[in-house]
Amino acid sequence: MLGYYHYGVILTYLSLVSSVIGISMTLNGRHITLAIVCLMVSGCLDAFDGRVARTRKNATDEEKSFGIQIDSLCDMVCFGVLPACIGFACGLNKWYHIAILALFVLAALIRLGYYNVMEMAQKNVDESGQRFFRGLPVTSIAIILPIVYGLMLYGKLLPWAGIILSVMFLAAGFGYVSQ
């Protein structure tokens, strides 16, 4: 079988499965809250997959590189596509909303691609050896979107949902690609 199957990458795979379930929950527009839960599960799994993978002392360079690549591919679905599907299911379905969602997904793609290039060139480390990141991490949407969604539902802001979500997706997208 192609690929690698150690604990860290299995967490990444589970994150993808959670997001695919979340995407399927948005298709009929009625299970948005479950899709939000799937997004949060993916965020939690993503928070630990790298840490778990780094505990493997005997990982080959190929396994490490595979883990980086598969994590970014998974992050694209989990924190790019799934949030956009949630936004669409929440009513962002006009042409200008779709343009905003497309820009959000594009920004996530650019951010993840840039991260991979910098990681491969080992340019994500400062002079003291500390790792750092540029731009807002795409996983942050797993915190931001549930909070905004909860405020909309329970804060009686549903009449403003389109504007609030549009601004949130634009701000997150610009955050992804900003220095």
Locations of the language-model features?
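Alpha-helical transmembrane segments of integral membrane proteins
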Residues: 6-13, 34-37, 69, 73, ...
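Cytosolic, membrane-interface loops and tails of multi-pass inner-membrane proteins
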Residues: 49-65, 114-131
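Multi-pass membrane catalytic core of lipid/isoprenoid biosynthesis enzymes
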Residues: 9-13, 55-112
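Helix-coil boundary and interhelical linker segments in multi-pass alpha-helical membrane proteins
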Residues: 21-37, 77, 81-102, 147-164
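C-terminal membrane-associated helical module and adjoining short loops/tails
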Residues: 125-179
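Transmembrane alpha-helical segments that form the membrane-embedded catalytic/substrate-channel core
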Residues: 46, 105-118, 168-179
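Juxtamembrane loop-transmembrane helix junctions in multi-pass integral membrane proteins
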Residues: 2-6, 30, 62, 66-69, ...
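Topogenic membrane-insertion module of multi-pass membrane proteins
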Residues: 1-50, 175-179
